[in-house]
Amino acid sequence: MQCYTELLSPSGVTHALAIPFLSASAENLVVVKTSVLQIFSLLKVQHHSRGETIETKSARPDQVETTKLVLEREYPLSGTVVDICRVKILNSKSGGEALLLAFRNAKLSLVEWDPERHGISTISIHYYERDDLTRSPWVPDLSSCGSILSVDPSSRCAVFNFGIRNLAILPFHQPGDDLAMDDYEFHLHQDDLNQVSDHVGNGLKSKDSTVYQTPYASSFVLPLTALDPSILHPVSLAFLYEYREPTFGILYSQIATSHALLSERKDSIFYTVFTLDLEQRASTTLLSVPKLPSDLFKVVALPPPVGGALLIGSNELVHVDQAGKTNAVGVNEFARQVSAFSMVDQSDLALRLEGCVVEHISDSTGDLLLVLSSGNMVLVHFQLDGRSVSGISLRPLPTQAGGTIMKSAASSSAFLGSGRVFFGSEDADSVLLSWSSMPNPKKSRPRMSNVAEDREEASDDSQSEEDAYEDDLYTAEPETPALGRRPSAETTGVGAYIFQTLDRLPNIGPLRDITLGKPASTVENTGRLIKNACSELELVAAQGSGRNGGLVLMKREIEPDVTASFDAQSVQEVWTAVVALGSGAPLVLDEQQINQEYRQYVILSKPETPDKETSEVFIADTQDLKPFRAPEFNPNNDVTIEIGTLSCKKRVVQVLRNEVRSYDIDLGLAQIYPVWDEDTSDERMAVSASLADPYIAILRDDSTLMILQADDSGDLDEVELNEAARAGKWRSCCLYWDKAEFFSSTGPALKQGTRCELFLFLLSIDCRLYVYRLPDQQLISVIEGIDCLPPILSTELPKRSTTREVLSEAVIADLGESWNPSPHLILRTESDDLVIYKAFASYIKGESHTRLSFVKESNHTLPRVTTSEKEMQSNEKLSRPRSLRILPNISNFSAVFMPGRPASFILKTAKSCPHVFRLRGEFVRSLSIFDLASPSLDTGFIYVDSKDVLRICRFPSETLFDYTWALRKISIGEQVDHLAYATSSETYVLGTSHSADFKLPDDDELHPDWRNEGLVISFLPELRQCSLKVVSPRTWTVIDSYSLGPDEYVMAVKNMDLEVSENTHERRNMIVVGTAFARGEDIPSRGCIYVFEVIKVVPDPEKPETDRKLKLIGKELVKGAVTALSQIGGQGFLIAAQGQKCMVRGLKEDGSLLPVAFMDMQCYVNVLKELKGTGMCIMGDAVKGLWFAGYSEEPYKMSLFGKDQGYLEVVAAEFLPDGDKLFILVADSDCNLHVLQYDPEDPKSSNGDRLLARSKFHMGHFATTMTLLPRTMVSSEKAMANPDSMEIDSQTISQQVLITSQSGSVGIVTSVPEESYRRLSALQSQLANSLEHPCGLNPRAYRAVESDGTAGRGMLDGNLLYQWLDMGQHRKMEIAARVGAHEWEIKADLEAIGAEGLGYL
């Protein structure tokens, strides 16, 4: 009984689409990452020359406008998206267009944006999984077939090609439809396969007053052979522009294309254009172009002014216009060999078009940008004679013009207008690019002009002259014009673009290998002061492809860079205050102004009794603290509630329990203002305070509110409150500066000429949120039922509920990067749960202003349970409440900090949702912002922990906070295929590869004709050139390298504790490398086993980290490729998969590897692992399934224990021991996870010969590695465990399996006890039935795997279970009651199946 939980969501972009989604005028980008849907808005910001970025509305004249991506919403989907398209429907809720998504297994989902919910709303879900369509024995399964989705540019219909030859057609209603209502009624026709959501309402009305119940009509399915009997092998299709009726072009062949049979099946592709008659469900053939090159694989519809379609092949581009006229260009020398089709010769470009992505970048010239699989960019230009295309020309984009911005292949693209284009990638970061035209003084007219008169009047002589200038634009010597190329005036656009990066979506996929290593200390000679601020181990993975290859460091918690540490005995609170020494506070600070015009105070509070404390004042001098004498600062030793600055940093304000003290810039006393009630003279004490210049909001112990305001001189005076605020009883108060004018747009309008940026948020005792505008104290909004924690908070009255959460605090704060913070409501419960709401404005019909609402953000971070009486006593020793701390600028982030254990930051980037990151270390008593006083360093923070250590820190450099873990990417510049940590030298050894041209060997005596290869072919094939590299974790740079031969490939790199002497039995840590010599499929492959030691050498004086080097200890050439390695047994031997054998070998003193035992295998062993120290190992065959064997040392022998019966295509595998049971996890090539068990006592296992299939689970991601890791006890288990019981030992040795994937996702499989499994299984069933799932998908069907019914109890879906935390309090308790469990039990179970078991990371 196991549970699969996704720790990191996929990061590689698979699909991208530009669409006005949020409104009719919105600029949105919809991105799909395998099974995650993200909706971005394009925000124009101002970028300063020094790197500073701010919003456009506050721009300064010396800044340049740029565009950034801002995430609106993110949805995990219970399905794998295969395509997306935009559809313009009638009367959408937002006024924008709708989104049509195609999923694996023939599903379509139509969604729109709902402004009232600030999220997507599913209009319909369409299933095409019908038996009569897929039951043919010679038709592959739907999951094995590709799917193509295309929508007519006028949104009249969509076509969905699935199951090879099935075509589903989904019509959409549009204004002016003349379709008969009888043919499109709401009742489902017998041929209709739609399952409609409840989005019916009062119907949709078009301009001709025809009322439709849904935005679409009944869909129908046709076989492609109904369009034309010759369409037997469809390749690609796309709807075309500029047709009155829905018209699409399709590439197909009558016989299967084959490179091996090229001589017989040359030019076998057809391109045909069909027009659809939706009313008659018929089609008409408009044109057909036969005998096209057989390597064509994609149809790209081109908008005006070019029109027609571009057909992309491996070696050529073919344009077909509306009349069937073709223009083609060959881009390498193979184009004329594989096809007899007439084409222009540009073979000197030597391009490989396989896997390329093309996107148009100019509406005026029709130019295209083509991204190759290597990441290089090529401009495609069409020569136009009026509306007719006379030729195609290509020009590689040079590096200085941005041609190498993409480091690897693109997977998708989207043209965003205004000179912007987006390229998504699964192998590198996705990029948002802008382009500008390069000025050319030789030309008299604008480069991007598209005036028809200029085209017609230009002479051939002038055009040829301009082409000569274009040839000199990027190259040093003139190029020979391509054969058959007709010069045109439009050729002036070729190569006239410069591209630059506007924004990036970080990607860590594909994750190729993973290892654990010890982190290098970031600060030397600090001893114990930094010991607790660093994890025991760090997770390092090999990521990326091609030039984008590198490493990624994964941190479960934030490990700050500590710049200074101090002993701080008995310090409980730390405060900072920055005062301005000059006349004012300039907006932009240079290095001298930071040091001369500002002074930073650090105040440490040490309690003496619960009601008394002493304050120590320091001045921050760079990274040192110098004592400062301030006799007037808190002389009465009162308890400090808050410290801040007012009057443009001219006054320091200290809010004490009994009074408010105001100081000048030298901390001389300026004013004392009492906290008691002046009307009744009752003694009152402050319990919390909020500062926002020039106001101070103070909440007193009788739940009453007091507001002070500073005048121009800095003196404080009490603000007279209105009746409601004065008489109310409040739980929490918060002042908020609305710099983005978000709340100013909600509520009643201000008088003309006035401006308001300050708002007061009050949480009442009965949990109502009041929003007041200052200084007029106008009530803007009242939101009830805050403690019900519903998904949407608005002014509408909530449903009555008897189940409510006990709230302790509520703050409104900005979250996000400094250039684009957004307001969020953060609620803290009594049990330290954090609930995060994002503010948004929803429009109200009939009113001029918008309504303030909040939408709940996902937060699956659970608070830790106090584990021991000692810890409880240490926490209770200080009875003061520790409030949330708002951090307006910390390392260029607006964040919120929660002290305690664990201490947590709430962080958000522009491209992510808010995430709760825990701070590594002990119980944090207090934290405050600390200005590091250096222009090269970001604003940091200072905190004190329970070990009486005061640290000055900053966020780790080059760290990404876009995901639930903190990530740091390190570029290597080559693809990293394998990775190992050398424990003896504390370095990482990488197996890398890069592309290199392959040349036949000149010294081959059997093939003397190979010596003339250069005369026959210049377009050489590319193969991988491999090498080994040593990386130091101190600087993350390559310090040594070992190159391999041109035909030798690294297949495995492992760190092993090997016996190096058969006489002394000495053992040392070695790096063992397995390689394969592959020289073609007609030559048997060989292999080699290398044994290296990373030794210490004399370093370069300027590079002290270069003190390590690879030393070759042993080398053994073997028959067959060495495809997998592992250590085995207890004598320091290794086992290697070489060819079709698995052989155990021992290292001798002469460097040879002596075989001692072996086992015959069958095909290709790609997985070989031992359950450490037991001799039991698994061998995964890529074709023949999984073998479970054992190795004995006396005598040396390999024995087969069991084998799976399903002949799984093993991609990755790992052991998972669970008590006295042994499970084996296997990931196959269809993204499924199989759980096998070795149980010889079960009769079905035939005495253990068969591995029993216990369950199957669809992960949705192609697994790359599985790693068995020890599991630490989580806080709930520690709290429930008896310290005197021996059960603690049995729990601490439990293990779990970490799974990485090609999409960049990281998952974990955890064994679940029987009691917890029953509880979580019932909860999963309730959630699957009661939740509203995005796009109308079924999570149960997504995770299920079709089988013969032999599988046992299913694996739990941790991502679905965690959605219980996102529900409102009433629904949460209702479902818990149905399950028959308490809230704390479910939370303990959820904590156990997450990342908390990785306590050492």
UniProtKB/Swiss-Prot annotation:
<keyword id="KW-0507">mRNA processing</keyword>
<comment type="function">
    <text>RNA-binding component of the cleavage and polyadenylation factor (CPF) complex, which plays a key role in polyadenylation-dependent pre-mRNA 3'-end formation and cooperates with cleavage factors including the CFIA complex and NAB4/CFIB. Involved in poly(A) site recognition. May be involved in coupling transcription termination and mRNA 3'-end formation.</text>
</comment>
<dbReference type="GO" id="GO:0005634">
    <property type="term" value="C:nucleus"/>
</dbReference>
<keyword id="KW-0694">RNA-binding</keyword>
<dbReference type="Pfam" id="PF03178">
    <property type="entry name" value="CPSF_A"/>
</dbReference>
<dbReference type="InterPro" id="IPR004871">
    <property type="entry name" value="Cleavage/polyA-sp_fac_asu_C"/>
</dbReference>
<dbReference type="InterPro" id="IPR050358">
    <property type="entry name" value="RSE1/DDB1/CFT1/CPSF1"/>
</dbReference>
<dbReference type="GO" id="GO:0006397">
    <property type="term" value="P:mRNA processing"/>
</dbReference>
<comment type="similarity">
    <text>Belongs to the CFT1 family.</text>
</comment>
<keyword id="KW-0539">Nucleus</keyword>
<feature type="region of interest" description="Disordered">
    <location>
        <begin position="434"/>
        <end position="489"/>
    </location>
</feature>
<dbReference type="InterPro" id="IPR015943">
    <property type="entry name" value="WD40/YVTN_repeat-like_dom_sf"/>
</dbReference>
<dbReference type="Pfam" id="PF10433">
    <property type="entry name" value="Beta-prop_RSE1_1st"/>
</dbReference>
<dbReference type="GO" id="GO:0005847">
    <property type="term" value="C:mRNA cleavage and polyadenylation specificity factor complex"/>
</dbReference>
<dbReference type="InterPro" id="IPR018846">
    <property type="entry name" value="Beta-prop_RSE1/DDB1/CPSF1_1st"/>
</dbReference>
<dbReference type="GO" id="GO:0003723">
    <property type="term" value="F:RNA binding"/>
</dbReference>
<feature type="compositionally biased region" description="Acidic residues">
    <location>
        <begin position="454"/>
        <end position="474"/>
    </location>
</feature>
<protein>
    <recommendedName>
        <fullName>Protein cft1</fullName>
    </recommendedName>
</protein>
